[in-house]
């Protein structure tokens, strides 16, 4: 089983790296350049025109892994990786539409927030019922990490909870994609956590482990082109795909609450944005952070007095995520009597 996950990682890394070799020049040739927000850090304007939609390279890599290494899982009747892939692809498609609108308008304004939320909610509810149909999710109970207990919950309440968590996760992960290499470096430890858990819990979770390991490998290949200074951005095509993948894995393993610790940096990013907007409105113009989300606050020298380099921010986010992934591992270690 471990060898299959390693193989999934290696194949995804290789495919992502090779696809990127051809994709980046192609995106430059068709002028698929990113428009930078004018209200962002001023030095980010130097990134104007950097190719976007680079997430296509790790999306292709994960698809190859699911149809190659995941083939044995399908032969044994395990389709978890395909459900997660399909769900992530739906969100990737929403992101692609958003990127397309931005490129067409030549400004950083794609789909309206309302349209994106409605599409995300529809996808979330459909996914939950599909996973329930194939036995991956129980809509009448909720697992509590660290306490190692499952508490009863009504089906309507679970669906509302699931929709909230999925849409919240999607938009939190998306906020993290604001510095070269940040979203990919923060999400890799999350996916490695799910891959390791599948080894611990046995063959039942092999297909999900293949998917998680494939994402981690694909992201490493993507970082060849996305690490500072980035030659390409993943765009909403890639970031929303990742958002969907992380949310799908949490629910497919039937432990969505693990995202409270495992996704700590996503939560910090989202909370910083919510606090900033709320405080700004309540105080008629005052701010808690120099700029939100939190990674921009660090870039602007908030609290510390010196401006953080992009590589330092990436190291901080990835390091904290690794620590909380270990903590999360402790929180679910005994779930299946390990």
What are these regions (language model features)?
Residues 77-112, 116-117:
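Hydrophobic alpha-helical hairpins/lids featuring a short glycine-rich hinge
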Residues 104-112, 144-153, 283:
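Membrane interface segments of multi-pass transport proteins and intramembrane proteases
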Residues 24-41:
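Membrane-interface loops
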Residues 1-28, 58-93, 127-133, 140-142, ...:
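Alpha-helical transmembrane segments
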Residues 111-112, 119, 124-137:
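Internal, non-catalytic "lid/hinge" segments that mediate substrate recognition, gating
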Residues 37-51, 106-119:
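Juxtamembrane helix-capping/reentrant segments at transmembrane boundaries
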């Amino acid at each position: 089983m471990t060898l299959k996950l390693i193989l999934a990682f290696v194949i995804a890394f290789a495919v992502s790296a090779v696809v990127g070799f051809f994709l980046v020049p192609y995106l430059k040739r068709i002028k698929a350049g990113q428009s930078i927000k004018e209200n962002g850090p001023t030095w980010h304007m130097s990134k104007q025109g950097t190719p976007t939609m680079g997430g296509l390279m790790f999306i292709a890599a994960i698809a190859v892994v699911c149809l190659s290494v995941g083939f044995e899982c399908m032969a044994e009747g395990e389709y978890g990786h395909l459900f997660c892939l399909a769900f992530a692809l739906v969100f990737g498609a929403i992101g692609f539409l958003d990127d397309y609108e931005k490129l067409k308008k030549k400004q950083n304004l794609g789909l309206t927030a309302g349209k994106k939320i409605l599409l995300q909610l529809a996808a979330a509810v459909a996914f939950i019922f599909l996973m329930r149909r194939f036995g991956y999710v129980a809509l009448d109970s909720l697992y509590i990490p660290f306490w190692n207990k499952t508490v009863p919950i009504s089906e309507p309440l679970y669906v509302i909870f699931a929709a909230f968590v999925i849409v919240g996760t999607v938009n939190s992960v998306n906020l993290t994609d604001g510095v070269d290499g940040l979203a990919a470096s923060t999400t890799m430890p999350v996916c490695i956590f799910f891959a390791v858990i599948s080894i611990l819990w046995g063959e039942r979770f092999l297909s999900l482990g293949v998917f998680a390991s494939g994402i981690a490998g694909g992201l490493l290949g993507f970082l060849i082109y996305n690490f500072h200074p980035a030659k390409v951005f993943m765009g909403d095509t890639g970031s929303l795909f990742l958002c969907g993948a992380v949310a799908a894995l949490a629910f497919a393993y039937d432990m969505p609450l693990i995202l409270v610790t495992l996704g700590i940096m996503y939560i910090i990013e989202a909370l910083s944005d919510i606090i900033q907007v709320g405080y700004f409105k309540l105080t008629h113009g005052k701010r808690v952070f120099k700029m939100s989300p939190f990674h921009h606050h660090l870039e602007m020298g908030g609290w510390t007095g010196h401006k953080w380099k992009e590589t330092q921010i990436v190291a901080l986010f990835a390091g904290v995520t690794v620590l909380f992934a270990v903590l999360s591992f402790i929180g679910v270690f005994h779930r299946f009597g390990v």
